[in-house]
Protein backbone atom coordinates (compact mmCIF):
# COMPACT_ATOMS: atom_id res chain seq x y z
CA UNK A 1 0.00 0.00 0.00
CA UNK A 2 2.88 2.35 0.79
CA UNK A 3 4.26 2.02 -2.74
CA UNK A 4 0.96 3.28 -4.14
CA UNK A 5 0.57 5.96 -1.48
CA UNK A 6 3.89 7.79 -1.88
CA UNK A 7 3.38 9.13 -5.45
CA UNK A 8 -0.23 10.05 -4.68
CA UNK A 9 0.89 11.91 -1.55
CA UNK A 10 3.70 13.77 -3.31
CA UNK A 11 1.31 14.96 -6.01
CA UNK A 12 -1.37 15.80 -3.40
CA UNK A 13 -3.89 14.04 -5.63
CA UNK A 14 -7.23 13.54 -3.84
CA UNK A 15 -8.49 11.20 -6.56
CA UNK A 16 -10.58 11.33 -9.69
CA UNK A 17 -13.93 10.78 -7.96
CA UNK A 18 -16.01 13.96 -8.00
CA UNK A 19 -17.38 13.03 -4.57
CA UNK A 20 -13.94 13.76 -3.10
CA UNK A 21 -14.15 17.36 -4.28
CA UNK A 22 -17.77 17.65 -3.15
CA UNK A 23 -16.75 16.63 0.38
CA UNK A 24 -14.00 19.25 0.45
CA UNK A 25 -16.43 21.79 -1.03
CA UNK A 26 -18.85 21.25 1.85
CA UNK A 27 -16.16 22.27 4.33
CA UNK A 28 -15.02 25.26 2.25
CA UNK A 29 -18.60 26.44 1.82
CA UNK A 30 -19.29 26.17 5.56
CA UNK A 31 -16.15 28.17 6.41
CA UNK A 32 -16.97 30.85 3.83
CA UNK A 33 -20.71 31.22 4.47
CA UNK A 34 -21.48 29.37 7.72
CA UNK A 35 -24.03 27.25 5.86
CA UNK A 36 -23.96 23.46 5.84
CA UNK A 37 -24.83 22.05 2.44
CA UNK A 38 -24.34 18.26 2.25
CA UNK A 39 -21.75 17.13 -0.27
CA UNK A 40 -24.35 14.59 -1.39
CA UNK A 41 -27.68 13.85 0.28
CA UNK A 42 -28.20 12.84 3.05
CA UNK A 43 -24.82 14.20 4.17
CA UNK A 44 -21.72 12.64 5.65
CA UNK A 45 -21.16 14.68 8.83
CA UNK A 46 -18.37 12.71 10.51
CA UNK A 47 -16.24 12.58 7.38
CA UNK A 48 -16.98 16.21 6.56
CA UNK A 49 -15.91 17.20 10.10
CA UNK A 50 -12.72 15.17 9.65
CA UNK A 51 -11.96 16.98 6.40
CA UNK A 52 -12.38 20.33 8.14
CA UNK A 53 -10.23 19.28 11.09
CA UNK A 54 -7.43 17.94 8.90
CA UNK A 55 -7.51 21.02 6.69
CA UNK A 56 -7.00 23.18 9.78
CA UNK A 57 -4.22 20.94 11.14
CA UNK A 58 -2.48 20.82 7.75
CA UNK A 59 -2.42 24.60 7.58
CA UNK A 60 -1.17 24.80 11.16
CA UNK A 61 1.65 22.35 10.43
CA UNK A 62 2.58 24.24 7.29
CA UNK A 63 2.03 21.39 4.83
CA UNK A 64 2.34 22.53 1.24
CA UNK A 65 -1.16 21.32 0.45
CA UNK A 66 -4.00 20.58 2.87
CA UNK A 67 -4.77 17.65 0.56
CA UNK A 68 -1.64 15.96 1.88
CA UNK A 69 -3.02 16.03 5.41
CA UNK A 70 -6.22 14.43 4.18
CA UNK A 71 -4.28 11.77 2.30
CA UNK A 72 -2.26 10.90 5.42
CA UNK A 73 -5.49 10.27 7.36
CA UNK A 74 -6.89 8.24 4.48
CA UNK A 75 -3.72 6.14 4.31
CA UNK A 76 -3.76 5.52 8.08
CA UNK A 77 -7.40 4.45 7.73
CA UNK A 78 -6.41 2.06 4.95
CA UNK A 79 -3.61 0.52 7.05
CA UNK A 80 -5.91 0.21 10.10
CA UNK A 81 -8.57 -1.53 8.04
CA UNK A 82 -5.94 -3.88 6.61
CA UNK A 83 -4.91 -4.84 10.16
CA UNK A 84 -8.53 -5.36 11.16
CA UNK A 85 -9.20 -7.57 8.13
CA UNK A 86 -6.08 -9.58 8.99
CA UNK A 87 -7.36 -10.04 12.55
CA UNK A 88 -10.68 -11.33 11.22
CA UNK A 89 -8.81 -13.93 9.16
CA UNK A 90 -6.65 -14.86 12.16
CA UNK A 91 -9.73 -15.51 14.29
CA UNK A 92 -10.85 -18.22 11.85
CA UNK A 93 -7.76 -20.27 12.74
CA UNK A 94 -6.61 -20.10 9.13
CA UNK A 95 -4.78 -17.02 7.90
CA UNK A 96 -5.83 -17.59 4.26
CA UNK A 97 -3.13 -15.23 3.03
CA UNK A 98 -4.26 -15.42 -0.59
CA UNK A 99 -7.74 -14.13 0.23
CA UNK A 100 -6.31 -11.41 2.46
CA UNK A 101 -4.05 -10.10 -0.30
CA UNK A 102 -6.83 -10.37 -2.87
CA UNK A 103 -8.86 -7.99 -0.70
CA UNK A 104 -6.21 -5.46 0.31
CA UNK A 105 -4.62 -5.28 -3.14
CA UNK A 106 -7.82 -5.19 -5.16
CA UNK A 107 -8.02 -2.08 -7.39
CA UNK A 108 -11.35 -0.84 -6.01
CA UNK A 109 -10.11 -1.16 -2.42
CA UNK A 110 -6.84 0.64 -3.14
CA UNK A 111 -8.51 3.43 -5.11
CA UNK A 112 -10.92 4.02 -2.22
CA UNK A 113 -8.01 4.00 0.21
CA UNK A 114 -6.00 6.54 -1.75
CA UNK A 115 -8.85 8.93 -2.54
CA UNK A 116 -10.53 11.40 -0.20
CA UNK A 117 -13.73 9.40 0.04
CA UNK A 118 -15.69 8.04 3.00
CA UNK A 119 -16.02 4.33 2.24
CA UNK A 120 -13.02 3.02 4.17
CA UNK A 121 -13.50 5.10 7.31
CA UNK A 122 -17.12 3.98 7.57
CA UNK A 123 -16.04 0.38 7.00
CA UNK A 124 -13.33 0.69 9.66
CA UNK A 125 -15.83 1.84 12.29
CA UNK A 126 -18.48 -0.66 11.21
CA UNK A 127 -16.21 -3.70 11.08
CA UNK A 128 -14.57 -2.67 14.36
CA UNK A 129 -18.02 -2.78 15.97
CA UNK A 130 -18.63 -6.19 14.40
CA UNK A 131 -15.24 -7.43 15.66
CA UNK A 132 -16.14 -6.38 19.21
CA UNK A 133 -19.53 -8.04 18.89
CA UNK A 134 -17.98 -11.31 17.72
CA UNK A 135 -14.82 -11.61 19.79
CA UNK A 136 -14.73 -9.13 22.68
CA UNK A 137 -17.79 -9.88 24.80
CA UNK A 138 -15.77 -9.64 28.02
CA UNK A 139 -14.58 -6.10 27.29
CA UNK A 140 -15.56 -3.33 29.72
CA UNK A 141 -18.31 -1.05 28.37
CA UNK A 142 -18.82 -3.55 25.55
CA UNK A 143 -22.28 -2.30 24.58
CA UNK A 144 -21.31 1.38 24.68
CA UNK A 145 -18.20 0.84 22.56
CA UNK A 146 -20.21 -1.04 19.95
CA UNK A 147 -22.85 1.71 19.89
CA UNK A 148 -20.24 4.48 19.57
CA UNK A 149 -18.46 2.71 16.72
CA UNK A 150 -21.76 2.04 14.95
CA UNK A 151 -22.82 5.67 15.38
CA UNK A 152 -19.54 6.90 13.91
CA UNK A 153 -19.95 4.50 10.98
CA UNK A 154 -23.48 5.80 10.37
CA UNK A 155 -22.26 9.37 10.80
CA UNK A 156 -19.68 8.76 8.09
CA UNK A 157 -22.29 7.31 5.72
CA UNK A 158 -25.95 6.66 6.50
CA UNK A 159 -26.02 3.38 4.58
CA UNK A 160 -23.61 1.97 7.18
CA UNK A 161 -26.70 1.39 9.30
CA UNK A 162 -26.43 -2.09 7.75
CA UNK A 163 -23.75 -2.84 10.36
CA UNK A 164 -26.30 -2.19 13.12
CA UNK A 165 -28.75 -4.66 11.57
CA UNK A 166 -26.02 -7.28 11.15
CA UNK A 167 -24.95 -7.00 14.80
CA UNK A 168 -28.53 -7.09 16.08
CA UNK A 169 -29.23 -10.20 14.01
CA UNK A 170 -25.97 -11.74 15.25
CA UNK A 171 -26.97 -11.16 18.88
CA UNK A 172 -30.43 -12.59 18.24
CA UNK A 173 -28.89 -15.72 16.74
CA UNK A 174 -26.54 -16.00 19.74
CA UNK A 175 -29.60 -15.53 22.00
CA UNK A 176 -28.09 -12.58 23.80
CA UNK A 177 -30.11 -10.78 26.46
CA UNK A 178 -32.87 -8.77 24.77
CA UNK A 179 -32.17 -5.78 27.00
CA UNK A 180 -28.58 -5.72 25.70
CA UNK A 181 -29.84 -5.76 22.11
CA UNK A 182 -32.33 -2.99 22.85
CA UNK A 183 -29.71 -0.81 24.57
CA UNK A 184 -27.29 -1.11 21.64
CA UNK A 185 -30.02 -0.30 19.12
CA UNK A 186 -31.40 2.65 21.08
CA UNK A 187 -27.99 4.11 21.96
CA UNK A 188 -26.81 3.84 18.36
CA UNK A 189 -29.92 5.56 17.00
CA UNK A 190 -29.72 8.37 19.57
CA UNK A 191 -25.99 9.00 19.05
CA UNK A 192 -26.40 8.92 15.28
CA UNK A 193 -29.22 11.43 15.57
CA UNK A 194 -26.96 13.76 17.56
CA UNK A 195 -24.36 13.56 14.80
CA UNK A 196 -26.79 14.52 12.04
CA UNK A 197 -29.04 16.97 13.90
CA UNK A 198 -26.72 20.03 14.18
CA UNK A 199 -25.95 19.96 10.48
CA UNK A 200 -29.52 19.66 9.32
CA UNK A 201 -30.64 22.17 11.91
CA UNK A 202 -28.13 24.62 10.39
CA UNK A 203 -29.48 23.94 6.91
CA UNK A 204 -33.10 24.22 8.08
CA UNK A 205 -32.45 27.55 9.80
CA UNK A 206 -30.80 28.88 6.66
CA UNK A 207 -33.82 28.05 4.51
CA UNK A 208 -36.35 29.38 7.02
CA UNK A 209 -34.39 32.59 7.66
CA UNK A 210 -34.03 33.34 3.97
CA UNK A 211 -37.59 32.24 3.07
CA UNK A 212 -36.32 29.97 0.31
Task: For the regions a language model picked out, list residue spans one by one.
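Extracytoplasmic catalytic/substrate-binding loops of multi-pass membrane glycan-assembly enzymes
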Residues: 11-26, 37-54
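Specific aromatic-rich, kink-prone transmembrane helix
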Residues: 32, 84-87, 102, 121-138, ...
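Transmembrane-helix motifs of polytopic, lipid-linked glycan transferases
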Residues: 1, 68-93, 125-128, 132
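Perimembrane helix-loop-helix junctions
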Residues: 135-139, 162-190
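Membrane-interface alpha helices of multi-pass inner-membrane proteins
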Residues: 100, 143-157, 164-168
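Membrane-lumen/periplasm interface segments of specific transmembrane helices
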Residues: 180-212
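Short acidic/glycine- and proline-prone juxtamembrane loop motifs at membrane-interface regions
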Residues: 40-41, 111-121
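Loop-to-helix entry region of an early transmembrane alpha helix in multi-pass inner-membrane enzymes
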Residues: 41-45, 49, 59-83, 112
Amino acid sequence: SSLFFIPVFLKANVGSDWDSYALIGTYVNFIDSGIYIPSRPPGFPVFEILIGLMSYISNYLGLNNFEQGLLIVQFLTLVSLNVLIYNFFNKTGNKKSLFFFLIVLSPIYLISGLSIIDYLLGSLFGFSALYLALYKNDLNYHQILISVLLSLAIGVRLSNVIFLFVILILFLIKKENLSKIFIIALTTVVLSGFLYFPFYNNLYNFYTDTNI
